[in-house]
């Protein structure tokens, strides 16, 4: 499991040769990504190089005294293609330098001339960790395939498919992003590719993790302030658009009868997917103006739909950075968790906000209108006649709704819907013993029962009425009883609450 598994999920099981050529002779470079370090405007450099053998991805790092510290060469086609796709992606296009200026050209020439010495340093005892991870022999310049399957981002041991670390404490040359990847791989709440967990199946080719883990991963990468971390972050969050999930405690069946009925109920954590968060790379700030009048980001809104967005509007129209400017501005702040339940349903004047009203009404649709087992008014289902004018629901559905109402405290305007529920629901029981040859049904039969959770709802409604907290709630001009769904009835009530000038009627009347 690795944070870049989705980006190269189609790689299959392949080995990657680390080490590279003893001599470096390229005739064209592209997609240059630079990052400054204290004392050196060119501390990190990543780019694509074209030589007689083909295309390769090269990483290099210098210290504050402009001494070359590490370098790596990767010519795996899938990896170079992924880096090229990131370079061409609309959210990162303006962050790459496509035509190097004089300063960058001098750095490229220096790197080319010092390549053999850099590779020798990588093979020295100081680079033993990387050597062990690559599974290389002691022969200098001899590249052998790693013992473990998959590939890793050059200079790391954990950022890739699987890992190539000898033990859990090992880190690669780029220790900062490698540490972030290692901690993200250890997220305790995750769903592996094509696996089922927390009530959902992951049909993707990459692991999805809890939103808390993704948030910590994003913060960790941004705190590194280097180009390698930003490549990992932009690819994982922006290009792949990998979602995350939050866990919600819900009541569900934990033991079943052989005939399909529920034998025991319990509270279990169920996953709810959240749209991916956008990674604000430190290099992207070069495309923005540092003036004080820059736009401030809008506060995050509660997520209501599980859809993926292509990127925030402020990324559109970003200008290509100056070739001479290699210093990144201050990193943007990481957005907080987005798995916050909608709050503040009441408006400033006590009215219901439209967004909160829709959120409340959707709970009635999810738990009642879409209830799998229900008996319509004056209909017979599961060998039971519902003589009432309102639908009769399975106790599982009403129990989940009651728990939702108890936890989220919806506005009093929806209390009328509780009255329509009544205090009874039904459970499914196995069929009665049927004598062979008799014409009797072998289907489950419904048994109407008095539900304690519904009685508590009614008690709460009466308490609110006695306190007078709902006397100002409007009553729609048309009666709610009829074939209208609970969702539509809820919308009708909340719309009336937002228009106090309409005809109103107190519950106490």
UniProtKB/Swiss-Prot annotation:
Pfam families reported in the protein's UniProt record: Phospholip_A2_2
Biased composition (Basic and acidic residues): 463-473
Binding residues annotated for Ca(2+), in chain numbering: 158, 160, 162, 185
Claim: Disulfide bond is one of the keywords in the record: yes
Entry comment describing in which tissues the protein is expressed: Expressed in kidney, heart, liver, and skeletal muscle. Also present in placenta and peripheral blood leukocytes. Not detected in colon, thymus, spleen and small intestine. In lung, expressed in bronchial epithelial cells and alveolar macrophages, but scarcely detected in alveolar epithelium, arterial walls and interstitial fibroblasts (at protein level). In joints of osteoarthritis and rheumatoid arthritis, expressed in endothelial cells (at protein level). In normal heart, detected in some vessels.
Induction details: By IL1B/interleukin-1 beta and TNF in microvascular endothelial cells (at protein level).
Glycosylation sites: 167, 280, 325, 396, 439
Family annotation (InterPro entries): PLipase_A2_dom, PLipase_A2_dom_sf, PLipase_A2_His_AS
Catalyses which reaction(s): a 1,2-diacyl-sn-glycero-3-phosphocholine + H2O = a 1-acyl-sn-glycero-3-phosphocholine + a fatty acid + H(+); 1-hexadecanoyl-2-(9Z,12Z-octadecadienoyl)-sn-glycero-3-phosphocholine + H2O = (9Z,12Z)-octadecadienoate + 1-hexadecanoyl-sn-glycero-3-phosphocholine + H(+); 1-hexadecanoyl-2-(5Z,8Z,11Z,14Z-eicosatetraenoyl)-sn-glycero-3-phosphocholine + H2O = 1-hexadecanoyl-sn-glycero-3-phosphocholine + (5Z,8Z,11Z,14Z)-eicosatetraenoate + H(+); 1-hexadecanoyl-2-(9Z,12Z-octadecadienoyl)-sn-glycero-3-phosphoethanolamine + H2O = 1-hexadecanoyl-sn-glycero-3-phosphoethanolamine + (9Z,12Z)-octadecadienoate + H(+)
Biased composition (Low complexity): 284-296
One GO cellular component term: extracellular region
Region (Phospholipase A2-like): 150-291
Post-translational events: N-glycosylation does not affect the catalytic activity, but is required for proper secretion. A nonglycosylated form is observed in several cell types.
GO MF assignments: calcium-dependent phospholipase A2 activity; metal ion binding
Textual note on the cofactor: Binds 1 Ca(2+) ion.
GO biological process: acrosome assembly; arachidonate secretion; cell maturation; cilium assembly; high-density lipoprotein particle remodeling; lipoxygenase pathway; low-density lipoprotein particle remodeling; macrophage activation
Cofactor(s) this protein cannot do without: Ca(2+)
The keyword Signal appears for this protein: yes
UniProt-listed Enzyme Commission number(s): 3.1.1.4
Record remark: domains: The phospholipase A2-like domain represents the fully processed form after N- and C-termini are cleaved off. It is the secreted mature form found in biological fluids.
Function: Secretory calcium-dependent phospholipase A2 that primarily targets extracellular phospholipids. Hydrolyzes the ester bond of the fatty acyl group attached at sn-2 position of phospholipids without apparent head group selectivity. Contributes to phospholipid remodeling of low-density lipoprotein (LDL) and high-density lipoprotein (HDL) particles. Hydrolyzes LDL phospholipids releasing unsaturated fatty acids that regulate macrophage differentiation toward foam cells. May act in an autocrine and paracrine manner.
Family (UniProt): Belongs to the phospholipase A2 family.
Protein name: Group 3 secretory phospholipase A2
Organism: Homo sapiens (Human)
């Amino acid at each position: 499991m690795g944070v870049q598994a989705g980006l190269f999920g189609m790689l299959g099981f392949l080995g990657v040769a680390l080490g590279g050529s003893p001599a470096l002779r390229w005739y064209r470079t592209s997609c240059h990504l630079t990052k400054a370090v204290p004392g050196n405007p060119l501390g990190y450099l990543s780019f694509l190089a074209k030589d007689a053998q083909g295309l390769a991805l090269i990483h290099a790092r210098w210290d504050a005294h402009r001494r070359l510290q590490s370098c790596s060469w990767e010519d795996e086609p899938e990896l170079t293609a992924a880096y090229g796709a990131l370079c061409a992606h609309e959210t990162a296009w303006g962050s790459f330098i496509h035509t190097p200026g004089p300063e960058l050209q001098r750095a490229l020439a220096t790197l080319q001339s010092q390549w053999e010495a850099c590779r020798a340093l990588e093979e020295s005892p100081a680079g033993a960790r990387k050597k062990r991870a690559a599974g290389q022999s002691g022969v200098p310049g001899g590249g052998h395939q790693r013992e473990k399957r998959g590939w890793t981002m050059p200079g790391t041991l954990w950022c890739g498919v699987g890992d190539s670390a000898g033990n859990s404490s090992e880190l690669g040359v780029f220790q900062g992003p490698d540490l972030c990847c290692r901690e993200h791989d250890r997220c305790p709440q995750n769903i592996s590719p094509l696996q089922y967990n927390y009530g959902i199946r992951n049909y993707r080719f990459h692991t999805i993790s809890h939103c808390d883990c993704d948030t910590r991963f994003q913060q960790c990468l941004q705190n590194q302030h280097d180009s390698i971390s930003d490549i990992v972050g932009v690819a994982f969050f922006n290009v792949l658009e990998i979602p995350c999930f939050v866990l919600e405690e819900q009541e569900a069946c934990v033991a079943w009868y052989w005939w399909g009925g529920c034998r025991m109920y319990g509270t279990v954590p169920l996953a709810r997917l959240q749209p991916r968060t956008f990674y604000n790379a430190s290099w992207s700030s070069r495309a923005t103006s540092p003036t004080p009048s820059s736009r401030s980001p809008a506060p995050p809104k509660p997520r209501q739909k599980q859809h993926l967005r292509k990127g925030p509007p402020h990324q559109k129209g970003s200008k290509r950075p100056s070739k001479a400017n290699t210093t990144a501005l201050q990193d943007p702040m990481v957005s907080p968790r987005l798995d916050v339940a909608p709050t503040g349903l009441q408006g400033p004047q006590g009215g219901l906000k439209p967004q909160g009203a829709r959120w409340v009404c959707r709970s009635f649709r999810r738990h009642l209108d879409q209830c799998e087992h229900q008996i319509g008014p004056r209909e017979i289902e599961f060998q039971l006649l519902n003589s009432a004018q309102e639908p009769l629901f399975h106790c599982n559905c009403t129990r989940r709704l009651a728990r939702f109402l108890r936890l989220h405290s919806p506005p009093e305007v929806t209390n009328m819907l509780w009255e329509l529920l009544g205090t009874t629901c039904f459970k499914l029981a196995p069929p009665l013993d049927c004598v062979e040859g008799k014409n009797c049904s072998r289907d489950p039969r419904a048994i109407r029962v008095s539900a304690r959770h519904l009685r508590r709802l009614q008690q709460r409604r009466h308490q609110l009425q006695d306190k007078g907290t709902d006397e100002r709630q409007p009553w729609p001009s048309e009666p709610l009883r009829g074939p209208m769904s609970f969702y539509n009835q809820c919308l009708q009530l909340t719309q009336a609450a937002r228009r106090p000038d309409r005809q109103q009627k107190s519950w106490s009347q």
